[in-house]
């Protein structure tokens, strides 16, 4: 019941004014009821599949950033990461010696004279057969105190399964002493390499989102193409493609009033041009700084595009959401929240999608002391998800996930240890999809 300036509720003492916290909760509930969001539909808590044994590699170095993970068609895992030891920075790669098994000896990707820029995100990694591609940031040789974050974006390649790497090639085609970073890397079904990154070459307050391609297995890079401007300066980009050759790039865009939205732009000509971006979740999150939290994408055989991302929305409550598009990125479904814990802070969501439309989403759950890695799974193209499941045993962070065409998923994350660090990997084989995605027409 409402009176002027008051909200009245029934109690044993009759009608009394609702407390201020109560009014806030009521208003939040009314607002949330109007938002275009599907409430979480969680399947049974039992995992619909089988997790393989955990494989742990120790890294007795001062600092480690990563990992990135890929899994080949035989089930062997690949990792890329950055490490610093005795003031020497290195971009590293390792490949499993058998499906789901131990990792082989690590290989240094960069030349000794090339000093990697120490950044928060792992090198981007693509593995197909004996072809291995890695993008990473080179500390700009002309960096100044006024431009301490200046970098050059580099692409390294191996054609012998990662045993050796060719000298890296430059990705950005401008000479500016600026930042070219927060990159993503993807190889489509026809072998084209697609690269996306954040670029400040125009000198504006907010940088732009740029893309390029390699059509010759990483030997050369095409001219750089600006997709959009007003990009959030440090939320990593994402790039993927569909079975019909459609290419998608995602990033966080800044709108008027410091509103930050996850957006997706699509290319209908294999990455030569891109259409204007489309807002995914309509979060209306006002935040006058960079959240440092990227989006992640995947596409199934039928062409459904899935996006996961982090936002705090209008209620300023941290959350991880998933949405999908069935019209090649023109519009998106209502968003669905995946995190359920009320005592932790969800972070760093990543998604992998197999051809049948089975999804694995992995993210961090941070508390005042603990830091966990959790996973939620859908076997029905996102209709329902399993209750989030904890994967780690010790304080962990930066989880990643990948999948091969056989539907075997690879999970990886970094575990804090003394006196060094550990990278933990694990495979996941899901049960067959109840209704598999049909091939795109």
Model regions and ranges:
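Residue-level detector of intrinsically disordered terminal segments
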Residues: 7, 14-17, 36, 102, ...
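Extracellular, repeat-based ectodomains that mediate carbohydrate processing or recognition
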Residues: 43-441
């Amino acid at each position: 019941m409402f009176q002027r300036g008051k909200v009245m509720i029934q109690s044993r003492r009759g009608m009394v004014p609702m407390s201020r916290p109560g009014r806030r909760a009521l208003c939040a509930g009314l607002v949330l009821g109007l938002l275009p969001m599907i409430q979480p539909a969680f399947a049974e808590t039992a995992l619909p599949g089988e997790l393989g044994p955990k494989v742990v590699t120790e890294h007795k170095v001062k600092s480690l950033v990563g990992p990135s993970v890929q899994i080949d068609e035989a089930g062997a895992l690949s990792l890329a990461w950055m490490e610093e030891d005795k003031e020497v920075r290195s971009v590293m790669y390792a490949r499993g010696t058998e499906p789901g098994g131990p990792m082989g000896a690590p290989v240094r990707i960069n030349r000794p004279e090339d000093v990697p820029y120490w950044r928060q995100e792992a090198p981007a990694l693509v593995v197909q057969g004996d072809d291995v591609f890695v993008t990473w940031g080179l500390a700009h040789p002309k960096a100044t105190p006024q431009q301490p974050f200046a970098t050059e974006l580099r692409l390294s390649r191996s054609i012998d399964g990662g045993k050796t790497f060719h000298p890296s090639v430059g990705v950005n085609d401008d000479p500016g002493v600026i930042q070219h970073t927060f990159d993503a890397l993807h190889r489509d079904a026809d072998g084209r390499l697609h690269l996306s990154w954040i670029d400040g070459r125009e000198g504006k307050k907010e940088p732009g989102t740029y893309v390029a391609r390699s059509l010759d297995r990483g030997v050369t890079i095409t001219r750089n193409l600006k997709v959009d401007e007003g990009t959030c300066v440090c939320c990593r980009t994402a790039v993927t493609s569909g079975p019909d050759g459609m290419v998608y790039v995602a990033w966080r865009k800044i709108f008027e009033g410091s509103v930050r939205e996850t957006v997706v732009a699509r290319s209908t000509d294999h990455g030569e041009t891109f259409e204007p971006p489309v807002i995914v979740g309509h979060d209306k999150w006002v935040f006058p700084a960079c959240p440092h939290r990227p989006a992640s994408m995947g596409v199934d055989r039928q062409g459904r595009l899935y996006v996961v991302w982090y936002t705090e929305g209008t209620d300023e409550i941290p959350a991880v959401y998933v949405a999908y598009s069935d019209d090649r990125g023109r519009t998106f479904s209502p968003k669905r929240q995946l995190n359920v814990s009320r005592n932790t802070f969800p972070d760093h969501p990543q998604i992998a999608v197999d051809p049948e439309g089975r999804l694995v989403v992995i993210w961090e759950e941070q508390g005042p002391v603990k830091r966990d890695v959790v996973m939620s799974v859908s076997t029905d193209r996102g209709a329902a998800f399993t209750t989030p499941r904890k994967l780690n045993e010790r304080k962990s962070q930066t989880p990643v996930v990948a999948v091969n065409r056989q539907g075997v998923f690879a999970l990886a994350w970094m575990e804090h240890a003394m006196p060094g660090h550990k990278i933990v990997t694990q495979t996941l084989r899901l049960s067959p999809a109840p209704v598999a995605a049909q091939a795109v027409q």
